[in-house]
Amino acid sequence: MSDRLAVLPQYLLPKQRLTLFMGRLAGARAGSLTTAVIRWFIARYGVDMSEAENPDPAAYASFNEFFTRPLRAGARPLAQADFICPVDGAISQFGAIERDQIFQAKGHRYTTTALLGGDRELATHFDHGHFATLYLSPRDYHRIHMPCAGRLTRMIHVPGELFSVNPTTARGVPGLFARNERVVCVFDGEHGPFVMVLVGATIVGSMATVWHGVVNSPRPGMIRDWRYPEGQVVLGQGEEMGRFLLGSTVVMLFPQDCLRFNAEWAPEKAIRLGEKMGDLFSCTPQAV
């Protein structure tokens, strides 16, 4: 079956209603029933609970608490690198941005402007730059950390579709990551601006940041834009910046000639938080 045919049912599903319903279930505190669901999920997806701060499934009052569980201390040491992997997951795609075109999958590209909610002025900072698209599967740790130190300047919530973001859907839905609901976080770092985009998906109840909390509840039909004064939110490399309540994808953008990716990186390669993502190449810092 072709990827386009495989994703056809997703066009017909009431994705918003399904996601709202599942989000409410995931937040429910149902005692032994919640624990049973968590145990089933651990067995179904092979979740390694030995890495969790609390490995006991019964310790989590809701499925959301389990899904966003913290890791035990020392579980993810940080590599000595200018840029580290911000998540556990797998590399969907990465590489050069061809002017403003980001590669999604064979036969599919989308623009930085579309990804950033139509803000062409912001997108120009990343023309001919670099991108990385990282997929978090259900079994993965679902907190998102900083690839490098940065000062938050903007956050943009872009409403949209809620297609699945698994590899099959990425191959079958044109412009997937610029169509789905997303939260765009804009930072200034030592090397210049960079962007982390948290992309929503079917059954992703919500996306949250450490400075705001849940961003997309309720889900308004308009773009929302927050600006942050200098020094209000500053995060170091490896610090938590956000989390998914049920998993999804992170897309990162970097300016031209700033980032040299880890030579061992390849599409579909499994990655872990704290591993080397790349090193600083050479660029002239410019504020957004």
Swiss-Prot record:
Keywords: Cell membrane, Decarboxylase, Lipid biosynthesis, Lipid metabolism, Lyase, Membrane, Phospholipid biosynthesis, Phospholipid metabolism, Pyruvate, Zymogen. Is synthesized initially as an inactive proenzyme. Formation of the active enzyme involves a self-maturation process in which the active site pyruvoyl group is generated from an internal serine residue via an autocatalytic post-translational modification. Two non-identical subunits are generated from the proenzyme in this reaction, and the pyruvate is formed at the N-terminus of the alpha chain, which is derived from the carboxyl end of the proenzyme. The keyword Lyase applies. GO terms for molecular function: phosphatidylserine decarboxylase activity. Its main location: membrane. It is found in: Cell membrane. It catalyses: a 1,2-diacyl-sn-glycero-3-phospho-L-serine + H(+) = a 1,2-diacyl-sn-glycero-3-phosphoethanolamine + CO2. The modification Pyruvic acid (Ser) is found at residue 248. Heterodimer of a large membrane-associated beta subunit and a small pyruvoyl-containing alpha subunit. Belongs to the phosphatidylserine decarboxylase family. PSD-B subfamily. Prokaryotic type I sub-subfamily. This is Phosphatidylserine decarboxylase proenzyme. It comes from Azoarcus sp. (strain BH72).
